[in-house]
Amino acid sequence: MPREKQKRGRRAEDKAKKDAAKRKRDEGPEESAVKRLKPSAETNTSNNEIISGADYIPLGQDDGGNDVPMNDAPANDMPFYGLLDSEEQEYFSKANEVLELNQFHDAEERRLFVDSVYREADGKELKVACSQSCSRLMEKLISLSDMRQIRRLFSKFIGHFLHLVQHRFASHCCETLFINAAPGVTEKISKSKGRKAEVDEEDEPEPELSLAEMFMKVVEELEGNWGYLLTERFASHTIRVLLFVLAGEPVDLSSTDSVVASRKKERLGIVNTEAPEEKAAAEKRKVPEVFEATLKKVMNDMVSGLDNTYLRALATHPVGNPVLQVLVFLELSHFGKASAKDPNSIIRRLIPDDDFGENAESSTFVRGLLYDPVGSRLLETIIKSMPGKLFKSLYKNIIRDRIGSLARNTTAGYVVLRTLERLGKDDLQDAMESIIPEIPGLIERSRLIVPKVLIERCLVRGVDTKPLSDALESAYDKDPAQRLEQMLKLEPAASEDDSEEKRKQTGNNQTAAAEKLHGSLLAQTMLTASGPVSGLIYSSLLAQSPDSLLRLAKDPTASRVLQQALTAPTSTSQFRRQFTTRFSGHLVELALDSSGSHVVDALWPATKDLFFVKERMAQELLNEELSLRDSFVGRAVWRNWSMDLYKRRRGEWASKAKGLDSIENGQRERPKSRIDLARAKFAAKAAEESSKAPVAAKT
C-alpha cells in the first residue's frame, strides 16, 4: 500500500490553523495575548492606565487625540536642507585648511580665494551652515567677507532664521553673521557702475534690502517665539547678539566678562583680519531709529508672557540667565536708569522693594543669588547698572555687614568685586577694614583677585593703603626673597634627576597655572601703588639672586612683574640703578628667550636716565650680533634697541638713548618764536585782568 504524502498534508494543516486564528480574531479579542506588541508613544500612557486599573480614565485621550495640533509649543520639526556630497565635503575641507594656514601673499589674494569659495558654495549655503564639519568654514568666511558678500549671504538666510538659530552648528554661523553685519546697518546700498559690472560678471543679483532691513526681517521671523528662544540652548547666544546689534552696543567676544558668546564658543580668529572691522564691532555704533522701537518691543515680548515667579527662576537658569543679564543691562543703560521706576520694567519685577527689609521679597531674591554660581552673575550685572539710590539701599541692608564673609566665598566674592567698584571713599574705607582680617585666608586659598581689586579701588578713591600693606606683609613670608616666590608660585629650580614626565605633569596643571597668573596680576597691581604696597615687591626683587632673576625673566607669567617694575611710574631711579645692573652679562641669553626678550625691551626705557648702563648693555648686545640676527625674538630686541643706529651713527644713538632725539615719536616740541611768546604773554595778562574784574566791581 503506497505511503501518504505527509508534506502536502502539513501545508494544508498549517493553512487551516491560520484560517481558524483569523476567524477567532474577527469574533473577539483573546483574553491572553500570546505575542506582545511594542506600544507606540501615543498609546503608551493610556495602556498603562488600563493595566494599572485606574479608577478614572478621561474620555478623548485616545480617540482623535492625534488630530488636534498642539499650538502651545513651537514646532520641533527641524527642516532638512540636504547633505554635501563627498566631492563638496573634500573641497570645503581643503578650503578650511587653506584659511587656517593663512599663507596668502597679500589681502588681495585672500579676497580672491574667499570669492572662489563663495562661488562654489552658491546655492549650498544652508547645507554648509548646518554641516558639522563645514560650519566652521562658514564662520571664517563671514569673518573675512566684505559688506557686499555679507549682504548676499544674509539674503540667502532670510526665511530660515527661526530654524537656523536653533541648530547646533548653524546658530554659530548666524551669530558670526550678525556680528560682522552690525557695522553696516547704517550704510546705504551703493549702485555704482563698477558694482553693476561686477554683478553682471558674476551673474548674481544684488540683494534689494539693506542690512538694516534684513535685521528687521530677522525680528519678524522670530516674532512670537521669543519666550521659547529665551531658554533654547542653541538659540540663546544668537538672541543675545541680536539684542546688542539692535541696541548699537559693542559686540566684543574677546572680553572676559562678555555675556554675548556661548560658554563653549570657539575662537575661530584668522590672523591679519581687517582691523577696522574688528574695531567697529567692539565700539558703540549708531543704529537706525527704527531699531530702538524694535528693541523695546522685542524686550517687552520676551518677558510679557512670563509671570514674576518664572522671571526670577530665569536668574538661576543656565541658558536663560545670560539673556536676562542682557535684558537688565540694556534696560538700565540703554533706556536710562529712570526706567527702573516703571513697575512693569524687568528690574522692578525682579526687585520690587526699595528698602530691602529683613523679610522683603527683594531681600529673599538677592540673598538667593549671592551664593548661586549662575544667579550671582545676574546680581553682578544688576549691581553694575542699577541706580545709585537702589544700590545704596542694597549695600546697606544686605552686603555691608557681611562683606568680609562674602569675600571669602568663591561665588559671592565676585559680587563683592562689583560692589567695591561702586563704593565711595568712606564706604570703601569701612569695607577695607572688614576685608583685611580675611586677607591671610584669601591668600592661603589663592583668592588673590579680592585684594587686587581692593588695591585698585583704593588708588582710585584715594584711600590709605598702609593697613592693606601690613596685612599683605603678614600673610607672606618675612624673607623678601621668599615672599615673591610665594606670591608667584615659583617652583624650585628643577634638578637633573627630575624626570621629564614629572615636568610635563606640572606644566599641564591648569590650577597651578591659574594661581601663578593671579599672583602675577596681584604683584603688578601692587607695583602701581606708591608707598609701602609697591615697596613689598621692590624689596623682594632686590633680594633675588642672579639665578632666581633669570628664572623670573624666563617665566612667561613672572616676567610681567619684572617688566612692570622696570617701567612703572612708582619705580625710582635709585631702584633702577641697583636693579638694571643685575642683568649685565645675561642680556643675550634673555634676548634669545621668548619671555626674557620682553624684559630686555623693558630695560630700554628703564635706563632712560642711566646712560652709562644703557651704553654698556648695547655693547653687550653688539658683541653677539650674529646670534641675535639668527633668532626671531633676537631680531626684535635688536630693532627695539636701535642697534643699527648704535653700530653706524653712535652720536645719534646717544641722543636717542638720552631722550633728546624724539623726532621718530613726534615728541619734540618746536621752539616758540617771538610772536608765540608775545601771544602767550598777552593771553596770560588778559586772564589775570578778567579774574580781577569781578572783585573790582564788587568793591
UniProtKB/Swiss-Prot annotation:
Disulfide bonds: none annotated. Transmembrane segments: none annotated. Residues 1-10 have a biased composition (Basic residues). It is found in: Nucleus, Nucleolus. Pumilio repeats lie at residues 120-155, 156-191, 361-396, 397-433, 540-580, 582-619. Its main location: nucleus. SUPFAM superfamilies: ARM repeat. GO terms for molecular function: RNA binding. It comes from the Eukaryota. Residues 41-50 have a biased composition (Polar residues). Keywords: Nucleus, Repeat, Ribosome biogenesis, rRNA processing. Residues 11-27 have a biased composition (Basic and acidic residues). Residues 1-66, 491-510 are annotated as: Disordered. GO terms for cellular component: 90S preribosome; nucleolus; preribosome, small subunit precursor. Pfam families: PUF_NOP9 (PF22493). The keyword Repeat applies. The keyword Nucleus applies. Belongs to the NOP9 family. PANTHER family: NUCLEOLAR PROTEIN 9 (PTHR13102:SF0). RNA-binding nucleolar protein required for pre-rRNA processing. Involved in production of 18S rRNA and assembly of small ribosomal subunit. This is Nucleolar protein 9.
